[in-house]
């Protein structure tokens, strides 16, 4: 039997990206680490900063809930979220966030932002990601990996699903993941893996890419 795989045109990809971008955020994690002074033997503290992407997955009457990788928020003293929408005042795009829940075994975390901290202008432009069903995926389906980590800028790559339920071990914990040849990097880690309809089917994990086959990206199925 013939096997038909829908192929996205450049126009389709642009349209999916345009629809998805308002649900993609940049997350900055500021922490503090101890550093021993070489001269006096005293302990000094040094600020650290790391960045990743996140996906708006729900909106309640009080807050926005954002999915990301656990390693993006791990050890955070201070978290901030930057929304990727055009704003009249650029300061409005960056707000403080709190970790709502973590699952280190699956490298997933949920971050919350109070709606009261987000201007009405920004709120009106944000979108909640449309959930897909990773159980319906087939090898050969086209996918889009999208993210917006600060320091990397907007990152979009297109590829195909290479394998499903691929066992990947990170920090001695094994998980079944979606394997794709779409590049998953620190620019889109924590961001969205979308199907050909623009629905969210996975959360990209650059940490998994470090441990896997070269040229292969991995996403945590949703």
Located regions from the model:
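Serine-dependent protease modules
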Residues: 1-222
């Amino acid at each position: 039997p013939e096997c038909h795989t829908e192929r996205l045109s450049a126009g389709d990809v642009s349209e999916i990206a345009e629809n998805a971008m308002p649900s993609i955020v940049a997350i900055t994690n500021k922490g503090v680490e101890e550093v021993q002074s070489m001269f006096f033997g005293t302990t000094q503290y040094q600020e650290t900063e790391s960045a990743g992407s996140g996906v708006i997955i729900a909106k309640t009457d009080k807050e926005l809930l954002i999915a990301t990788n656990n390693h993006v928020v791990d050890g955070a003293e201070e978290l901030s979220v930057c929304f990727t929408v055009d704003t009249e005042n650029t300061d409005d795009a960056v707000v403080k966030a709190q970790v709502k829940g973590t699952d280190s075994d699956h490298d997933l975390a949920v971050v919350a932002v109070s709606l009261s901290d987000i201007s009405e202008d920004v709120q009106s432009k944000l979108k909640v990601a449309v959930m897909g069903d990773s159980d319906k995926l087939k090898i050969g389906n086209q996918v889009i990996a999208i993210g917006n980590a600060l320091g990397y800028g907007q990152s979009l790559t297109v590829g195909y699903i290479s394998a499903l339920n691929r066992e990947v071990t990170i920090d001695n914990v094994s998980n079944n993941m979606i394997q794709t040849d779409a590049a998953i990097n620190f620019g889109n880690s924590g961001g969205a893996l979308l199907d050909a309809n623009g629905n969210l089917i996975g959360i990209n994990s650059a940490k998994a890419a470090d441990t896997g086959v070269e040229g292969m990206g991995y996403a945590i199925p949703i």
